[in-house]
């Protein structure tokens, strides 16, 4: 082999090694489910603005965001480890790190515990003990109650399991105030009632996947029209709950207007999906992902309104 050939071979090997390291790092990041973290933090930070009635200290926001991200990431890692058997069989999840054997279950467990410990330390030391305790409770609930107890046993898995995703609203409030009140409880409830429509829309799209691994999501065991009906019921309760923040927290006029408009748009989309599902099981007709994406946009904009309301009220 010529010198040029040797150099080319070495270069290719070096690129492969770099790609391998990059793949492993990306796999560890993927285990934390970054999109879920983004959504959780999108509820945390606006609540901090609302609790402060202005702009909270930057260091406090950073500590809460980092601690919250590590906590949510830790819970997701444990979820991936426990669910690796069904993740291997589902189209939506088979490209995750554990099904692809890029990361071993033992290494993932260590990673999850490290993230969880770091999260607790950060929140306890730089935020406050109450926020740290709520974070630990959310993590434990998601892993022990939802992942290990409910997910594979009941159609109500995501209804009650979704409680874990509501905790960031409480943590954002306690990070600023150091205590709880009815205000964050209302926002907690908004996320609670938002979770079933959001998740059932996604589960309807991937119902064959869930059926193949015997996870009894509602769209697996019920016809699409019943899923649509349940989505509409939860959506109405969610919108009504979101409007409770006005009298409970004494918001300015901006929030109820924004919540009303966003709620009306979301309800329209929920009713449309229900109407499309009444006479067919065809996903191309029902288009559940329209509601899924609408739900993401709804929650994001609603909590932006939560953050903006005290700023606009002056």
UniProtKB/Swiss-Prot annotation:
Coiled-coil intervals, chain numbering: none
Cysteine disulfide links: none
Keyword Transmembrane in annotation: yes
InterPro entries (alphabetical): Protohaem_IX_farnesylTrfase (IPR006369), UbiA_prenyltransferase (IPR000537), UbiA_sf (IPR044878)
GO molecular function: protoheme IX farnesyltransferase activity
Membrane topology label: Multi-pass membrane protein
Name listed for the protein in its UniProt record: Protoheme IX farnesyltransferase
Gene: ctaB
């Amino acid at each position: 082999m010529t010198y040029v050939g040797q150099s080319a071979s070495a270069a290719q090997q070096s690129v492969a090694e770099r790609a391998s390291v990059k793949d492993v790092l990306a796999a560890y990041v993927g285990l934390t489910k970054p999109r879920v973290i983004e959504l959780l933090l999108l509820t945390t930070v606006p609540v901090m603005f609302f609790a402060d009635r202005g702009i909270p200290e930057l260091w406090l926001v950073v500590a809460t965001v980092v601690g919250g991200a590590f906590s949510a990431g830790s819970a997701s890692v444990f979820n991936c480890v426990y669910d690796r058997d069904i993740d291997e069989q589902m189209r939506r999840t088979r490209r995750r790190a554990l099904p692809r054997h890029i990361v071993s279950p033992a290494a993932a467990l260590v990673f999850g515990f490290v993230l969880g410990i770091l999260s607790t330390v950060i929140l306890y030391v730089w935020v406050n003990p109450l926020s740290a305790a709520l974070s630990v409770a959310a993590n434990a609930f998601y892993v022990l109650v939802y992942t290990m107890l409910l997910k594979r046993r009941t159609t109500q898995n995501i209804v009650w399991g979704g409680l874990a995703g509501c905790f960031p609203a409480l943590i954002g409030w306690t990070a600023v105030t150091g205590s709880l009140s009815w205000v964050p409880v209302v926002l907690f409830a908004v996320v609670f009632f938002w979770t079933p429509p959001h998740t059932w829309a996604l589960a309807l799209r991937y119902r064959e996947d869930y059926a193949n691994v015997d996870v009894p999501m509602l769209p697996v065991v019920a016809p699409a029209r019943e899923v649509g009906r349940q989505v509409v019921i939860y959506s109405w309760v969610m919108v009504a709950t979101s409007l409770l923040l006005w009298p409970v927290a004494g918001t300015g006029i901006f929030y109820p207007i924004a919540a009303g408009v966003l709620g009306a748009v979301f309800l329209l989309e929920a009713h449309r999906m229900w109407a499309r599902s009444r006479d067919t099981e065809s996903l191309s007709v029902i288009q559940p992902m329209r509601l899924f994406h609408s739900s993401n946009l709804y929650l994001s904009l609603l909590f932006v309104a939560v953050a903006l309301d005290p700023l606009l009220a002056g």
